[in-house]
């Protein structure tokens, strides 16, 4: 059983942050606040969400994008991190899995995800 003070703090953290509804297969743009010396800037990371795991304050998601020279780049973000400015859902993907780790082995058009029709 959790300490009631810790539980109250976690509930406040979750309530203070508005997170859009997204799943694995969705294309996201995450705006991350980066501190460099005494300056702060916002950097966008855009890619496909390949997994969500955990629950509550400790919940994380993995985003994969194809960078320069066709090199795959993956980043793991805590959903309720203070360094995340915003999460924007660009496309809803149509997939039948919760974890899309098989995309790591695919290249080119094979790595495309169909868009969810409304």
From Swiss-Prot:
Domain of life, source organism: Bacteria
Q: Which GO terms describe its cellular component?
A: cytosolic large ribosomal subunit
Q: Which GO terms describe its biological process?
A: translation
Q: Mind telling me which InterPro entries this protein's record contains?
A: Ribosomal_bL19, Ribosomal_bL19_CS, Ribosomal_bL19_sf, Translation_prot_SH3-like_sf
The record's annotation in Pfam families points to: Ribosomal_L19 (PF01245)
Q: Which UniProt keywords apply?
A: Ribonucleoprotein, Ribosomal protein
Annotated GO molecular function terms are:
structural constituent of ribosome
The intrachain disulfides are none
Q: Check the record and name the SUPFAM superfamilies matching this protein.
A: Translation proteins SH3-like domain
List the PROSITE patterns hit by this protein, alphabetically: RIBOSOMAL_L19
Q: Does the keyword Ribonucleoprotein apply?
A: yes
Name the family: Belongs to the bacterial ribosomal protein bL19 family.
The name of this protein is Large ribosomal subunit protein bL19
Origin organism is Campylobacter curvus (strain 525.92)
User: Upper lineage ranks?
Assistant: Bacteria, Pseudomonadati, Campylobacterota, Epsilonproteobacteria, Campylobacterales
Gene behind this chain? rplS
